[in-house]
Amino acid sequence: MSREEAIASLKQMPENLRQQVAGLTDAQLHFQPEGGYFSVLENICHLRDIEIEGYGVRLHRVLAENHPALPDINGAQLARERHYSEQSLQPALDAFTRARHANLNILEGVTKTQLTWAAHLEGIGEITLGKLLELWAEHDRGHVQELEKLLAAVR
C-alpha cells in the first residue's frame, strides 16, 4: 500500500464511522457479541484511544526520536479500565475525529525519507514509518469489518 493510499484510507474513517453508527439505538450500540468482542460503542472508544495513545504517539515518536521502542497497547485492558460500555458515543466519535485530523495533518507532511525511519514495535518487531502507516490503515479496516458484522446482527 502506498503512502497516498494509506492516507486516503485513514481520511475516510471518521465519515465511515459516522455513517455506520447513524441512527443506532442505545441497545444496538451496547449489543455485546459472543466471544468477548467489542460492542459498537466499545469499538468507537477503542478507536479513539488507539488513535490518540497508540498510532498518534507512535507517529510523533518515530518522527522525533532515533529508532524508538514503541509499546503495544492492550485494547481489552483499556476497555475494562476505562469502562467503555458506560461512555457516550458522540464525545468518543468527536475525539476520534479530532485526533485523526491532527494525525493526518502530520502525515501529509511526511517525506519519503521519513517513511524509511525505523522503530521497534512491541509484538511486531522492526518497522518503518511507512509500515506503521500500513498497519494503521489495516487496523481501521479490521474495525470496519467488525462493525459491519455487528451492525448486521443488530439491525
Language-model segments: residues:
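Small-residue-biased structural context
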Residues: 1-3, 7-10, 14, 82-89, ...
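Alpha-helical bundle segments that constitute or directly flank the non-heme di-iron/ferroxidase center
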Residues: 1-28, 50-61, 135-138
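Alpha-helix C-capping/helix-to-loop hinge sites
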Residues: 27, 46-47, 81, 87
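Amphipathic, soluble alpha-helical interaction motifs
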Residues: 16, 20-23, 27, 58, ...
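Acidic/histidine-rich alpha-helical segments that form the ligand environment
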Residues: 9-14, 20, 77-116
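Short, contiguous alpha-helical
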Residues: 30-75, 104, 118-155
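Short coil/turn linker and secondary-structure boundary residues
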Residues: 1, 24, 38, 84-87, ...
